[in-house]
Amino acid sequence: MRVALIGATGLTGRSLVPLLAADHQLHLLTRRATGLDARETIAPMEEWPARLGGDPVDVAISTLGTTWRKAGSWPAFEAVDHDAVIGFARAARAVGASQFITISSVGADPESRHQYLALKGRVELALADIGFDRLDIMRPGLLRGPRGGDRRRGERIGVALSPLTNLVMRGQLNRFAAIDATTVAAAMVALVGAPREGRFVHHNPEIRALVG
């Protein structure tokens, strides 16, 4: 299938690219060269929708996201996690994408008092309004994997303690447990081209089930 991806250089994206490239025609839209084995369009984030315009797409995927440390302000954070994702999704739909797969967050809710979770909830609503035949929303817990120095102090502590905390997060709490980014990437690949139409939300248990 013809797959377009944004977020290839992030924690999940780096695992996702080789899996997608093995079986699909993959097109990466990125702000800088990735060194990954896939076709790349290198352009400022604001230009991605226009750069996608000439190529038909079957499935569009976003693993794009920034950190507060990188963004430096809420408007800059929102420009990446909301505006760039929605702009890419609309452009992908315009060139034929029938499925969109994205990473959100456990607890995403447009009515949340938590600014980040409210933003993720608004992104989900906006994506649902674009008109994809199938929308897959991944809502993992804390993602484990090598991020270098990009993690907040609380995230670093959470990842370090996750082998212990995951032991007590059972039942409904399991959706809040830490999960490997490689597992999320494999689940996203498993969803590419899924036949049923609709909006599907995948928490940790569903993500792990997709990988088997």
Q: Which residues are covered by each model-predicted region?
A:
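A short helix->loop->beta-strand "cap" motif at the edges of active sites that frequently abuts
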Residues: V95-Q99, G131-D133
